[in-house]
Amino acid sequence: MKPTRRRFLQANLLGGVAATFPFSTLGADSTAAGQGSYNPRYRRLDEILKEPVLKREFFSTPIIIESLELLRYKDSFLCRVRSRDGAEGISVGHSGLNALYPIFTHNLQQFFIGKDARDLDLLLEKVFIYGFNFRYNGISIGTPLATIEFAILDLLGRVAGKSLGQLIGDVQQPEVTVYQATEYREKSVEESLELIKRDVAEYNAHALKIKIGGLMFMTTDINAVGPPGRTEKIIPLIRKTFGDSMALFADANGFYSVDEAIRVGKLLEEYRYGFFEEPVMFDWREETRQVASALQLPIALGEQEYSLHGFRWVIANDAVEIVQPDNYYFGGMVRSMQVARMAAAFGKKCTPHMSGGGLGFLYMMHFVSVLSNPMPHHEFKGLRTNVQFECKTSPLKVVDGKIRVPTGPGLGVEIDPGFIGKHQRISG
């Protein structure tokens, strides 16, 4: 990374699959990095990917998975896992399971039955091979797989008396500092500003991310475009409105071409934004690198990335300074931690993308709590949830821009048995 980009990152942010997956090193790029898989940077990342994530030393005897269930009540999904010796874990599924639950029941569920939960790292590798599951990729397999992993981690945490974070790392952030993520791309600048001010005020946010560009994902109108000139107007207006003390970030969701991304990136630099998320489409890795090379502004990426190999490339080739694996979309905390470790090896930061709904904010908090290379602020979309639960170790309120991470075993909360009881088992 250029030294000036490193200084930009520090000044603006602080101030304001390879060895683990047999297919992941095939086709490694040999142009940008020079020597493909033999490049020293790739070799370093491959060594990191060999390192276990789950702290198996907490468990002296096998923990055999006896049952794994997906439960549904209307649009709510829970995963419940039980071991042969009676231990139980539960997770809250992503709303995307409305469309994806058949992959849970048909492609993943049976694979885990009878396995030792202590082998979680290996299970998360081999499940992609089972039934050629790697053909599905992306959120289609990542979301149901994460739902399973979260439940297994909850079970293991309860057995060991450890939080989810403690199972995959050492707690370094007992509180997570958040940024308010906002939407409103399709609305006028004036209406967007009022809604953003409302969101910031609700949680007294000290950091904020806005949407830019014109990706009209919310409509079936193939001719839809965003309000003319919205991006060019809102970037300086947000800085003027919230002042120099507010940390600002921007997300294009892959809308721009390389040239347009560079143009908009320079405007973001002028108004001291902290990072530019997905300036071009997520799988345009070489184009992302071109944008990064032209800007001092750090580039962030990872919400849509579905492979360890993809993250390996963008890290090794300095296409990004910030990685953003989504714990749900990417298949869980173990895989996301592998990404964070790769990033740390080359001085890059990690801040997970956070899916809204359910208890996504809790999984995000546990993950961030053990990062060695966290960003100063992490994505937050509010505390609203349909899940009925109790947390005895944290008020789960935003205070001075921070939320205290639960310290109880597993997820650190107790989901209301009555709420669980409303859910019915989905059979294959």
What are these regions (language model features)?
Residues 149-187:
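Glycine-rich, aromatic-flanked loop segments that form ligand/cofactor-binding clefts
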